[in-house]
Regions:
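Intrinsic-disorder/low-complexity accessory segments
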Residues: 1-323
Length: 323
């Protein structure tokens, strides 16, 4: 990790930049993980090659350095080399980033599981949190500096102190209880939770994701403030959504059944295709995608390669492949 800023190819990189040396015994492993990947556009279907552009799928910036002279100047500002235990200790010591004025109000960047979990914790504690509705921070959260301090040490947050009079926001009334579809029945023999652990991947992943973000979950749709998940909705959940329950559905099971909920929707899946990285555009800026737009997230990972080939004229398209 660099201890001072340095300049390479006209770009200045700050202290704290991670450097992975190719002068090590396992350099091929590191290069295999970090190289830019292989673009194959001559085949319409490809299963055997996994996506290797980890910087794009995992969300970090990466630059390859191939000039010996630059190795020396960059190495000169690096700290000691780290092994696995050192890396774990380093990440454990990371703290939230705060800029701007203290003792005013705080913009929390809506950029991670931690930011959502922090907001949910504040809401459950009866604190006031808003979502910014316009301007450069549209889609981010805002709270008091005192409330920010109660969660800053528990989560990794990007925050900026601001004068609230310059920010337009809508108060979030509560931390929503989320219905996760597809709750498996308990086993009648042996370990009762076997279906949940080993036979219900979609439900399991969704439940884990909601827990990571601090949401309370329920298997009873009548007790939910929203629904989200990869499993197809049952009859009761469909009725609730049609009656106005907010719903986030993804995966083939959910997307292919969208026509059951909304007239005029058609879903198309490329036969045999698996996944891809695709450039995207955002046709409409809303509170749902504003933080993606602000962060310049113009490449997204797609699993399953299904897409909505037709939507109603009244629909708001949030993201679109720009192939």
């Amino acid at each position: 990790v660099t201890e001072k800023e340095f300049t390479y190819d006209g770009v200045t990189y700050p202290a704290g930049t991670m450097i992975v040396s190719m002068y090590q015994a396992k350099r091929s492993v590191a290069n295999g993980v970090l190289y830019d990947g292989t673009l194959i556009n001559g085949w319409t279907i490809l299963y055997s090659e996994g996506i290797t552009s980890f910087n794009e799928t995992r969300g970090f910036d990466m630059v390859a350095v191939a000039e010996p002279a630059a190795y020396k100047s960059i190495s000169a500002v690096c700290g000691d080399a780290m092994d696995h235990d050192d890396a774990l200790a380093y990440t454990k010591a990371l703290t939230s980033c705060f800029t701007g004025d203290k003792n005013k109000d705080v913009i929390l960047s809506n950029a991670s599981e931690d930011s959502t979990a922090a907001v949910n914790e504040l809401l459950k504690a009866g604190k006031t949190v808003g979502m910014v509705t316009s301007g450069d921070h549209m889609g981010d959260f805002i709270c008091s500096y005192a409330d920010y301090q109660t969660v800053a040490g528990k989560y990794l947050l990007s925050a900026a102190g601001v004068d609230k009079t310059s920010v337009k926001a809508k108060i979030i009334t509560k931390s929503p209880t989320v219905y996760v579809p597809g709750t498996p029945a308990e086993s009648e023999k042996g370990f009762v939770y076997t279906p949940q652990i080993s036979q219900s991947a979609g439900w399991n992943y969704d439940t884990a994701a909601m827990n990571l973000m601090g949401f309370t979950t329920t298997s009873d749709v009548t007790k939910a403030d929203a629904a989200a998940g990869a499993t197809k909705l049952d009859a009761a959940a469909k009725t609730a959504v049609k009656n106005g329950l907010p719903y986030i559905g993804y995966s083939y099971s959910a997307a292919s059944s969208a026509s059951d909920l909304i007239a005029g929707v058609e879903y198309t899946e490329l036969d045999g295709a698996m996944d891809c990285l695709t450039p995207v555009v955002y046709p409409n800026k809303t509170l749902v995608n504003a933080s993606y737009i602000a962060d310049g997230d113009d490449i997204l990972y797609a699993y399953g390669l299904g897409y909505f080939s037709k939507v109603p004229a009244s629909a708001t398209v949030l993201v679109k492949s720009d192939k």
